[in-house]
């Protein structure tokens, strides 16, 4: 049976459903092919970081997630004693949201379906091939029938063992695991007083966070078990023994609902695009799960790719736009792999290692150092290469935080509210600006700032991308300001034939 969609996503985890939602709000006919008939009940990831929360806020769905999670104003770097302080960061979401991945996935799947995405669960992708004009995806449906989908693009969001990546023959260089650790979702009859614990001694490291009123995630890194193969099952007795040795108590650990062993393998796809095929999330990059960053970076991949694919499909993308996905997101994941490798090296239980950890913890107590590292973990410091065809500006390529605006009619609105439909926003901060520019996919807003903002001082106009990054900004002092703005609009809205 032959079916047609404009875009096919292989992999129905959080990244796949985030991408499907982005395509759907742009009116792109999309389907998701997911091997599992039902979502996995356990959760690998537990946290959504500030930048991811900003993206959800841009689409007007943040409260759905916040209502089911718990806000934590801090994060951690390599389980050091000094926590990362998110509360002072320049964001409307200065916290980590503790929310199990299973709930995140459910919310994103529901959102994607509500926007019209078709989901094939219990379906296995067998072959993904392309020519210059289309992609053919052959899959086995849950009833055993073999179907073929023809689409303009396909995206592999199908995890570390990605079928899409392998069939596209995209290299996945990196390193295999050299150490392993264990985790368990358990009941603790005598939990830590605050419910949260991060501890490292010469006997190993432990992290404990609450999942629900009666269940906790326990992570143990034992120097005596780091060479245990990943496929060796974790036992309740192992977790209890390690807790007792490291913490002096096993906290009354009982009733594990899920236990797993994980390693520090680190790999990254050599390229994120091969013609009409793209990779996102774990299909593009894997790493040691330090700092809870992997899911977040994957969701940010989806947010970067969605509007670009939609523009290409609708015929409004300049020729260079699709290549910019790799150019922007590959370096972002390189930074992720660097900082998680650094965190892995810091998890050292020798005497020298503990001294190094103590010194690093002291350094994190300096506000500037803490802010720098927090910017990396939160992904708020991700900045894309500036558009070199436009005059240099300190804002070009940076994310733009949410802010209160006073509109020309005197009413106030939050900046992110204008991004809910996934369009570009041309924000003019001068009342004399031309607010009659009409370009499909561009919303023009003339406003003033409700509060002084040094970063925006003397700025005339900003073109804000659908993912909240600044495409370009023009200062009021720029020569031929109006001409430069028109040039910038033409640069990003070059009309092409539909692909």
From Swiss-Prot:
A single GO molecular function, which one?
oxidoreductase activity
Residues noted as binding FAD in the record, renumbered to the chain: 6-35, 272-282
- UniProt keywords, alphabetically: Aromatic hydrocarbons catabolism, FAD, Flavoprotein, Monooxygenase, NADP, Oxidoreductase
- At the top of the EC hierarchy, this enzyme's class is oxidoreductase
Named cofactor requirement(s)? FAD
Report the superkingdom from the record.
Answer: Bacteria
Member of which family?
A: Belongs to the PheA/TfdB FAD monooxygenase family.
PANTHER family hit by this protein: BINDING MONOOXYGENASE, PUTATIVE (JCVI)-RELATED, TRK SYSTEM POTASSIUM UPTAKE PROTEIN
Q: What is this protein identified as?
A: Uncharacterized aromatic compound monooxygenase YhjG
């Amino acid at each position: 049976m032959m079916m047609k969609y404009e875009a096919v996503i292989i992999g129905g985890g959080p990244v796949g459903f985030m991408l499907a939602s982005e395509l759907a709000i742009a009116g792109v006919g999309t389907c998701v092919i997911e091997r599992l008939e039902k979502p996995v009940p356990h959760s690998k990831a537990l946290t959504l970081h500030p930048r991811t929360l900003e993206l959800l806020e841009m689409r007007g769905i943040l409260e759905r997630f916040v209502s089911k999670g718990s806000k934590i104003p801090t994060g951690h770097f390599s389980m050091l004693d000094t926590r990362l302080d998110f509360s002072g960061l320049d964001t409307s979401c200065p916290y980590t949201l503790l929310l199990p991945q299973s709930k995140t996935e459910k919310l994103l799947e529901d959102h994607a379906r509500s926007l019209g995405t078709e989901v094939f669960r219990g379906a296995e992708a067998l072959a993904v091939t392309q020519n210059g004009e289309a992609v053919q995806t052959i899959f086995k449906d849950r009833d055993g029938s073999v179907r073929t989908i023809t689409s303009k693009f396909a995206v592999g969001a199908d995890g570390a063992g990605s079928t899409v990546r392998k069939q596209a023959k995209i290299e996945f260089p990196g390193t295999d695991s050299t150490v392993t650790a264990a985790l368990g979702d358990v009941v603790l009859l005598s939990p830590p007083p605050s419910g949260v614990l991060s501890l490292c001694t010469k006997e190993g490291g432990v992290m404990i966070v609450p999942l629900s009123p009666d269940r906790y995630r326990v992570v143990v890194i034992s120097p005596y078990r780091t060479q245990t193969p990943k496929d060796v099952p974790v036992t309740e007795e192992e977790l209890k023994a390690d807790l007792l040795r490291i913490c002096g108590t096993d906290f009354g650990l009982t009733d594990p609902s899920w236990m797993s062993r994980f390693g520090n393998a680190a790999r990254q796809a050599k390229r994120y695009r091969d013609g009409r095929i793209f990779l996102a999330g774990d299909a593009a990059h894997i790493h040691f799960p330090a700092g809870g960053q992997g899911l977040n970076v994957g969701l940010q991949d989806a947010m970067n790719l969605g509007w670009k694919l939609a523009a290409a499909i609708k015929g409004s993308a300049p020729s260079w736009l699709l290549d910019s996905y790799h150019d922007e997101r590959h370096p972002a994941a390189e930074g992720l792999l660097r900082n998680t490798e650094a965190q892995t090296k810091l998890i050292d239980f020798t005497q020298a290692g503990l001294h190094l950890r103590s010194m690093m913890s002291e350094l994190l107590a300096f506000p500037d150092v803490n802010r720098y590292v927090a910017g990396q973990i939160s992904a708020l410091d991700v900045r894309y290469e500036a558009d070199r065809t436009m005059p240099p500006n300190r804002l070009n390529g940076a994310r733009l935080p949410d802010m209160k605006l006073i509109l020309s009619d005197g009413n106030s609105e939050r900046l992110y509210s204008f991004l809910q439909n996934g369009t570009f926003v041309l924000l003019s901060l001068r009342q004399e600006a031309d607010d009659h520019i009409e370009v499909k996919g561009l919303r023009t807003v003339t406003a003033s700032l409700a509060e002084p903002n040094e970063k925006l001082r003397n700025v005339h106009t900003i073109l804000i991308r659908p993912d909240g990054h600044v495409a370009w900004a023009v200062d009021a002092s720029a020569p031929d300001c109006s001409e430069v703005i028109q040039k910038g609009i033409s640069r990003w809205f070059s009309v092409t034939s539909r692909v």
